[in-house]
Amino acid sequence: MSAKRSIGDSEILKKRIPQNQKYEHIKTRLDTGNSMTKYLERIEDIKRNYRYKKDELFKRIKVTTFAQLVLQVASVTEERESGEMTTDELQRLEDNSSVISDTEFLTDRPNGKGSPANESNSPIQFIDSERGEELIQTSRSTLQSVISGVGELDLGNQADIKKESLPSSSALDKPYEDCPFLLLDVRDRDSYDQCHIVGARNYPIAMLSRTMNPFTPEILEYRNAHGKIIILYDEDERVASQAASTMCERGFENLFMLSGGLKVISQRFPQGLTTGSFPITCLAPPTQTKSALKRTPKDPIIPAENKWRFSSQDLEMIENHLENVLMSTSTPSRLRMDSRNSKVPSSASSARSQSSTSSHSKPWK
């Protein structure tokens, strides 16, 4: 007798669905909860925009954390220059602005030297984490506690601050007084003149190769200073990581690198943080067809302006982009909380129906 044959082709389940490149960029409508697609997209985003390496000597600061720092520094400077903030309030801000404990600060140091007893805390310590959703809710990335202290002066309520008229050009030409961070652009001068973050100073990586006076007076002033940090950035972390490693090897302990550089800024903060036109390497490739690309004209290259402060329009755009980024990252967690809350009443009602005969029902567990 012949063996029993199965109906149909046994290889039908291994057949792949043909993909059309024309519709690869189109996403599904249902995009809630955790899925393998989101996980793979997150991994691809990390590989595309970041260059993580093992045993990095320097620390990282996220673009969103840097944007919060910019907003808080601008708010404090505005209050100070308007005369509404007294000297005692500023002293309380400095005394109560520590976020990380002595033990955490010791572990975050690049070389792990020193002890908690003889090392002073820096009021600004931001560590980039691989889990961006959880980092938003932690005290490390919440700059309200850095600037506002324990509540003596609440500067986080942006709605209560009245936005004045645009500052004059002379006011934008001056850097922020007593700024807690020094922003350094480690690219060459031509790239700096094309596009850079407002308030950044040009410090090419070739300066580190000098045998005499490799550091500027501003860098020496901020080097390992209490309550001050140095932030390096470039386009895609290629140059900034080398410069940060070299400076950490030379004794810089308050050094941070801006994760992603201008490439991530162009995606999350296309307006407000920078001046000038973004480099072509930082812009995302278009998803249009060839015929549409031929018809669309190229945007003119605008050189960067020589301004050291953010205008009120820049701060408003930064705040809007920051809210959009934080809302997009916190949406899955809120959906999970809503789903949990929606399940509780149904379970409680079923428990009450089962114990309706008794006068006092037991709580649901």
From Swiss-Prot:
InterPro entries the record matches: CEP41, Rhodanese-like_dom, Rhodanese-like_dom_sf
Location(s) in or outside the cell: Cytoplasm, Cytoskeleton, Microtubule organizing center, Centrosome; Cell projection, Cilium; Cytoplasm, Cytoskeleton, Cilium basal body
Alphabetical UniProt keywords: Cell projection, Ciliopathy, Cilium, Cilium biogenesis/degradation, Cytoplasm, Cytoskeleton, Protein transport, Transport
SMART domains reported in the protein's UniProt record: RHOD (SM00450)
Sequence segments annotated as region (Disordered): 104-125, 329-365
Record flagged with keyword Nucleotide-binding: no
Rhodanese domain residues: 177-274
Biased composition (Low complexity): 342-365
GO cellular component, one term: ciliary basal body
UniProt-listed GO biological process terms: cilium assembly; protein polyglutamylation; protein transport
Main location: cytoplasm
Family to which the UniProt record says this protein belongs: Belongs to the CEP41 family.
Record's function text: Required during ciliogenesis for tubulin glutamylation in cilium. Probably acts by participating in the transport of tubulin polyglutamylases between the basal body and the cilium.
Protein name (Swiss-Prot/TrEMBL): Centrosomal protein of 41 kDa A
Organism the protein comes from: Xenopus laevis (African clawed frog)
Taxonomic lineage from the root: Eukaryota, Metazoa, Chordata, Craniata, Vertebrata
